[in-house]
Amino acid sequence: MTEAPAEFPPEDETPPRGPGDEWVIGILRELREEALKHFDPRLLTTLGNYICARHGDTLESARELINVLQRALFVHFRAGCKISRIGQTRGETPFSAIPTPRGMQ
């Protein structure tokens, strides 16, 4: 009796995909660097702590933080960020109609 040949999955010529975890973490790092140019670091730290408390230290929390940072940066750019090429050229923000609270001028 002959021994059956070992079975191997077919080899395709495509390069193996990297884990999605590394991609998500890379995107989060890029967004964090960009967000630090536009927002107060204390705000970003508080946001990160809130999301980690809500979702735990998981990939889901990283995805949620990416989602929130993308939205915040989008609104910030659309409001007329002075250091960005993206956004309105008028110079006014939609928040200029809101009066500044006393003691914050």
Swiss-Prot record:
Q: How does it assemble?
A: Interacts with human UNG.
- Gene name for this UniProt entry: vpr
Report keywords, A-Z: Activator, AIDS, Cell cycle, Host G2/M cell cycle arrest by virus, Host nucleus, Host-virus interaction, Modulation of host cell cycle by virus, Phosphoprotein, Transcription, Transcription regulation, Viral penetration into host nucleus, Virion, Virus entry into host cell
- Its job: Stimulates gene expression driven by the HIV-2 LTR. Prevents infected cells from undergoing mitosis and proliferating, by inducing arrest or delay in the G2 phase of the cell cycle. Cell cycle arrest creates a favorable environment for maximizing viral expression and production.
Q: Which residues cross the membrane?
A: none
Q: Pfam families of this UniProt entry?
A: VPR
Q: Which domain of life is it from?
A: Viruses
Tell me where the signal peptide lies.
none
One Gene Ontology cellular component: virion component
| Presence of the UniProt keyword Transcription in the record | yes
Q: Which residues carry this modification: Phosphoserine?
A: S84
Q: What is this protein called?
A: Protein Vpr
| Organism for this UniProt entry | Human immunodeficiency virus type 2 subtype A (isolate KR)
Q: Where in the cell is it found?
A: Virion; Host nucleus
Q: Which GO terms describe its biological process?
A: symbiont entry into host cell; symbiont-mediated arrest of host cell cycle during G2/M transition; viral penetration into host nucleus
Region of interest called Disordered, as start-end residue ranges on this chain: 1-21
Q: What is its main location?
A: virion
